[in-house]
């Protein structure tokens, strides 16, 4: 009840100041700006800080046995000005215990076998550590700008593979969020204690990882990071193919179904330990199989340095779509690196692993099989787009989902246009991202800025379609070049950090050189929707005036499609800037000496909730 009241107060205050277009912020956010960790200029404040850690993780398994055993050493650095007397540990695997994790029949989660902090045994009770957060008290406080070392041994039984992690089949496993980790401690919320219940996603610090995965012979491992010992775990021919793929634009079949049947791809030790390294990244994930095909190639993502990113795919031989995944990803990385966001793909690799989740991880994608190749490519495009948001930008997915899903949805449309043409991409975007929202009920609509855990209606709309439309509306208003300049300002300011919505707003204003408060207020701080009405078309001495009413409220672009009496047509585009002075009623002037026969207002992908009032003269409804 207190949470609802607080949100209501925030939004009530926002509406009270609507005339001034104030971008209201909660007290804890305002406090971060006041303390100097955030800046109204868009960049991190002079006193900005963030914590990080080094993880050295060793995992072992022996499929089809689903028991996963791990040990890890963590060096955690407290860069904050605060003295930490406890650490909050994230145990995401416990999400599989369900909504009643303490019930006697609840599935088992992760079990910590031993935990030491700075060499001393820490207090840990597995019977209490059943949720996705567990606070650990420190015997000695962790002082500002100091570090500590943790050693943890743990095990758990892998769940079924229908979600973001689990057993895909009896000998194909996907491990994600599989290790205890220190949660984010930041400058505006302190410890991130947001429970993970399976719906919302994640928020992690940028850390360095060493990952060792021990599996029986003939099992291949794919993981976040760069493989350190290919010549130890692969037979020479397959190590040679892998190395060749690092400079090849064409797909190289590292391991085919025939190769797998021969059972001579890996070193023939009883077990092999695959070792991976990655730096300044927010998480690691891995896939394991003894019967998945392995394709690979690479692509130049940075023309200045000629840096290449490795592209790999792991999949069942019967999945025709995955045979195309390396080729698809080659196009994806090339397009994203050179168009929008127009930032070279920031990591050394991407791998698509066949599973069930259609889910992104740093350098990894867990995608389901589909017979529709166009849809398969679109899904992979969307998941790889998440490389930038959140994995490059470090946003809080669990609290501000629109800061990553909205961008991935936007890039999905833009690259889809390049791949399939504007008409097909627009139609998919409307059907998959917009129509259900815009034609649905709006009485319970909540502003996009609403923290994701507090969205009680239309959470998917607030995370995907609505924010994506806001980004596209801004692109339409600023124009491609200025929009890209502003976006790069935001990304340059905040990559590898932890931006919040107000950092985005301030960076985009700074990068564009324009005061966009009115636009951001309209799109993010109101419960608006899309519904324009063409109320009147009036002849004037120089042409015509179109009188439009913005019933829904969002500042959207639109086309005025004019049909003249002589049969000719003209389309006049209006960007969202037309709504800056008056967001409810505007007049659009049409200069012409021709007689207008009819006018239709069409928003394209900005789908109108009620098209019946978008045409003049008004067409009588059929009886």
Enumerate the predicted regions with their spans.
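Short, hydrophobic/aromatic-enriched beta-strand segments in well-ordered soluble domains
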Residues: 72-74, 91, 146-160, 209-217, ...
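Solvent-exposed beta-hairpin/edge-strand motifs
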Residues: 84-120, 214-219, 563, 568-574
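Hydrophobic helix-coil surface modules that form long, contiguous segments used
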Residues: 186, 201-381, 410
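A surface-exposed beta-strand-loop module
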Residues: 26, 67, 77, 104-171, ...
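Glycine/proline-rich low-complexity spacer/linker segments in large multi-domain proteins
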Residues: 99-106, 155-209, 229-230, 605-623
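Early extracytoplasmic/domain-onset interaction patches
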Residues: 24-88
């Amino acid at each position: 009840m207190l949470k609802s009241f607080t949100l209501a107060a925030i939004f009530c205050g926002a509406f009270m100041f609507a005339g001034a277009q104030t971008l209201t912020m909660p007290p804890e956010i305002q406090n971060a700006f006041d303390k100097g960790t955030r800046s109204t200029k868009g960049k991190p404040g002079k006193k900005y800080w963030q914590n990080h850690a080094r993880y050295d993780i060793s995992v072992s398994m022996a499929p089809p046995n689903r028991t996963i055993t791990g040990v890890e050493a963590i060096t955690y650095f407290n860069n904050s000005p605060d003295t930490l007397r406890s650490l909050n540990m994230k145990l995401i695997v416990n999400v599989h215990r369900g909504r009643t994790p303490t019930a006697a029949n609840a599935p088992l989660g992760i079990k910590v076998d031993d935990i030491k902090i700075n060499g001393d045994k820490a207090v840990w009770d597995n019977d209490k550590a059943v949720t996705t957060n567990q606070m650990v008290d420190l015997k000695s406080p962790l002082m500002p700008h100091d570090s500590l070392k943790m050693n943890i041994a743990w095990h758990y039984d892998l769940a079924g593979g229908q979600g973001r992690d689990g057993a895909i089949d009896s000998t194909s496993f996907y491990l994600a969020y599989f290790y205890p980790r220190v949660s984010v401690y930041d400058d505006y919320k302190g410890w991130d204690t947001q429970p993970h219940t399976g719906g919302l996603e994640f928020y992690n610090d940028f850390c360095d990882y060493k990952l060792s995965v021990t599996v029986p012979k003939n099992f291949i491992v794919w993981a976040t990071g760069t493989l350190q010992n290919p010549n130890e775990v692969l037979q020479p021919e397959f190590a040679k193919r892998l190395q060749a793929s690092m400079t090849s634009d064409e797909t190289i079949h590292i391991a085919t179904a025939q190769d797998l049947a021969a059972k001579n791809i890996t070193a023939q030790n009883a077990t092999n330990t695959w070792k991976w390294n990655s730096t300044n990244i927010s998480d690691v994930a891995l896939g394991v199989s003894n019967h998945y095909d392995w394709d690979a190639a690479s692509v130049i993502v940075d023309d200045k340095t000629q840096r290449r990113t490795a592209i790999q795919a792991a999949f069942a031989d019967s999945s025709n779509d995955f045979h195309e995944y390396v080729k698809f990803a080659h196009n994806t990385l090339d397009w994203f690196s050179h168009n929008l966001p127009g930032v070279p793909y920031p990591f050394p690799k991407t791998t698509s692993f066949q599973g069930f989740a259609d889910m992104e991880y740093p350098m990894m994608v867990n995608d389901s099989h589909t017979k529709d190749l166009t849809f398969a490519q679109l899904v992979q495009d969307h998941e790889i787009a998440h490389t930038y948001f959140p994995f490059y930008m470090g946003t809080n997915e669990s609290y501000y989902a629109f800061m990553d899903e909205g961008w991935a949805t936007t890039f999905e449309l833009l690259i889809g246009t390049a791949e399939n043409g504007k008409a097909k991409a627009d139609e998919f975007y409307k059907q998959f991202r917009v129509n259900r929202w815009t034609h649905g009920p709006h009485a319970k609509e909540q502003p996009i800025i609403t923290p994701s855990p507090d969205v009680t209606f239309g959470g998917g709309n607030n995370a995907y379609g609505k924010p994506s439309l806001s980004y596209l509306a801004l692109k339409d208003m600023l124009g491609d070049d200025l929009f890209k300049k502003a976006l790069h300002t935001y990304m340059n300011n905040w990559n590898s950090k932890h931006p919040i919505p107000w950092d985005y707003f301030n960076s985009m204003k700074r990068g564009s050189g324009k005061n966009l408060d009115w636009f951001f207020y309209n799109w993010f701080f109101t419960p608006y929707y899309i519904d324009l009405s063409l109320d009147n078309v009036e002849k004037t001495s120089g042409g015509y005036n179109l009188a439009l009413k913005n019933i829904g409220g969002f500042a959207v672009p639109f086309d005025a499609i004019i049909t003249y009496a002589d049969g000719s047509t003209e389309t006049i585009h209006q960007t969202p800037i037309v709504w800056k002075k008056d967001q409810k009623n505007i007049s659009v002037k049409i200069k012409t000496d021709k007689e207008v026969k009819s006018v239709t207002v069409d928003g394209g992908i900005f789908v109108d909730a009620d098209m019946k009032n978008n045409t003049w003269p008004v067409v009588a409804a059929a009886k």
